[in-house]
Amino acid sequence: MKTKLYLAILSATACSFSAYSANIYDNHESKLDIFGDITAMVCNDRAARALTSVKEKGNHDNTLHTAVNFGISGKTIINEHADAVAFSEWMMPTDSNGFDEFKTKGQYVGIDGHQYGILTLGRGDNAFYTITGVTDVYNQLNTYAHDHYVWGDYQQGLFMYALSAMGFDLRISYQTAVDDVSDSNVDLKNGAAIALATTTSSGIGIAYGISYYDLKKKDVTDGSAFYTDNLIKMYHRSDKDYAFANALQPSFKIDRGFSITYGNFGDGLYLALNGTQTKYDNFTNHLYALETIANYHFENGFSATIGYSLKRFADTNLLSDLTFGTYYQVMPTFNV
């Protein structure tokens, strides 16, 4: 079957006023920092629907959107080989994002073992973000083609370990049980992920990773409602038959993926490509996703990013987006 490619164009222009960090306490053994940013963004309608900080958008017009992030981080020296660390970041409530309360992003405590790596416990990115994160550069504008984000861009209940040694970066994570993850009616029993990355002398970065989720089956239709859209496409059905979907509830989910990058984001030219494959138990088809972006950052504070995202399932394009964004971050000096 020949499938047409439906392309949605998302565009946004942003002006970011950022105070990256300020030290508010330091006694040589312990220190506490605060950080944050304020962003104003002009978006077309399609882009506004893809903003990560918008709860919902019901109209069909262009919009001016503001977003505020605030965070706090701390460190205490335990001994010459280890430090205790803590971190928390929130999305602040604003009139334009639909949230009337604080929304937690990353939040964890841990031990920084210096050359032995860092172990953290709490809410954050699992190890597979090493793969998907190379194209997660749009600040607020994200279409999230990869199924890694199906339950949100942050996960709670994570053990996370990171080690950099001998030219390689290793990340390992373990997911503990979470009920009704991201209000999806899906319960996670446990999960794990691992990723390995390296960068060549020419500036090319290569990474490969895999993640696994053990899913808890539910005996009620609420537990299967999350999967009905994919099942309709997979079996070419026209109705949301929850009883049918309930019989095909998956018991596990596996993501595999790779990424290739060139350069460093925010420093001149940056290029990135990643691809992922997702397998749900009891699904006869795999989900495939591809994202690619090109970014250039100028010394005067301007940057421009263009990217393409594709997600396919059962010979159907679930998503096909061309995204363009221009950004300006206020700098101490401005030269054109």
Q: What spans do the regions from the language model cover?
A:
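Primarily extracellular Gram-negative trimeric autotransporter adhesin
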Residues: A19-E29, F226, M331
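Outer-membrane beta-barrel proteins
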Residues: D45-R49, D95-F99, T130-G133, D179-S184, ...
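Extracellular loop and loop/strand-boundary signature of outer-membrane beta-barrel proteins
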Residues: V54-N59, H146, S182, A243-A247, ...
